[in-house]
Amino acid sequence: MSNRIEITKDFYKAFADGNRDFIEEHLAEDFTFSSPPDPHLDRAGYFRRCWPGAGKGGQFEFTRLIESGDEVIVTYEAQQGENTGRNTEILTFDGDKIRKVEVYFGWNVI
């Protein structure tokens, strides 16, 4: 398994655990985050908008982890309370740093 795949898995675990130090260490300075409600957040915007959801004990079950060039494509199922949802995200790397995350929302898993 590649180092980028391992970093990606650890990135999601760090988010679930609320480990901001790991996240800070692995984001590029010019990091951007985009999702349908939050297109093109910068690093500070990511922490302002997304970090309040970290450390809530949610778990990610990966159904797809594919490395292609500088990208890792991730599909996961995650629980939030009683609901389980499925999303796909594309993480773009610059070396071992995550430079960009693009989120594509999925659906609830029944």
Map each language-model feature to its residues.
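Basic/polar N-terminal segments that are highly enriched at the extreme N-terminus
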Residues: 1-3, 109-110
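Short, conserved clusters of charged catalytic residues that mark active-site
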Residues: 6-7, 57
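Amphipathic alpha-helical repeat scaffolds
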Residues: 9-13
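Residue-level signal for short amphipathic helical patches enriched in basic/charged
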Residues: 14, 18, 93
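Short, well-ordered alpha-helical segments enriched in acidic and aromatic residues
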Residues: 17-34
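A beta-strand edge to alpha-helix "cap/lid" segment located at domain peripheries
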Residues: 34-36, 47-110
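Short, catalytically relevant binding-site loops at active-site mouths
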Residues: 39
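PAS/Per-ARNT-Sim sensory domains
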Residues: 42-43
